[in-house]
Amino acid sequence: MTDLVVEDGSIVGANVEDLESTYRIDAKKTIIATGGFTRNADLVAKYAPDYTSAFPFTGAGGTGDGHVMAEKLGAPIIGSGMMGLSGINPSLGYYGPIGGAVWSAQMTVNAEGERFMDKKFYGDTLALLVEQTNSCGYGIYDASNEIVDRLEAGVEAGVVAKYDNLDDLASGQGIDADALKKQAESADIKSAPFYCIQRKPLFIGSIPGIKVDEHCRVVNGAGEEIGNLYAAGEVMYANVFDGTYPASGSGVGTSCYTGAISARDALAALA
């Protein structure tokens, strides 16, 4: 889709293109369900400037097309923050035998050697990481960890660092050694060898979105309905939650029920 077709202030369809041609689709009702903008660095800088150090771990289609089109029509983009967690890199993220090792850190510290993450509420992980020096947390493990075999595989892959002692770990990773050792003692991390994974901030979704009413109808800056236009799913998340990722399932759940709300309202209007 390249843009929406407007007649007399209402949406009557969309202009689209494929590999061979450009054409118009007429529609009595249009629902924007284009997802987020995690794959569009310019929109991240525009709508969530505090999060430019994070990388996307999302589908390739999250380029924010719906946000751009709606804003051109006068619809406000509301909300702040991004949805995200921590991962190793854009390929491994936090999945699989190696990527998933980020979840098993015995503690995570910043470059100052301070623990800053709450294991009980991981929804704040992204927001906390981007605030740290180098936008990075350091997951610390020792030989007693139950996933040592996976850590060793990570060492072989070049994404997990292994050290004989905590002083070498601190030096190798640029962490304050005294603070690190103090935190390690409190966490009972004492069995050599020691391992470290750099936990980087990653996106799993975006929050800022198109402003809608309770029927998921898109509205303009004055709160007036833009005729025949709806928004559902990630493209309008900020109407439901804002700032940080509330909990697992928040995005999928919101997408399901806003899709149903918008579709039911559109069908009722056409009946």
Regions found by a protein language model. Give the residues of each.
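Short, small/polar residue-rich loop motifs at catalytic or cofactor-binding pockets
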Residues: 101-103, 204-206, 248
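Glycine-rich loop(s) and the adjacent beta-strand/alpha-helix scaffold that form part
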Residues: 18, 24-89, 252, 261
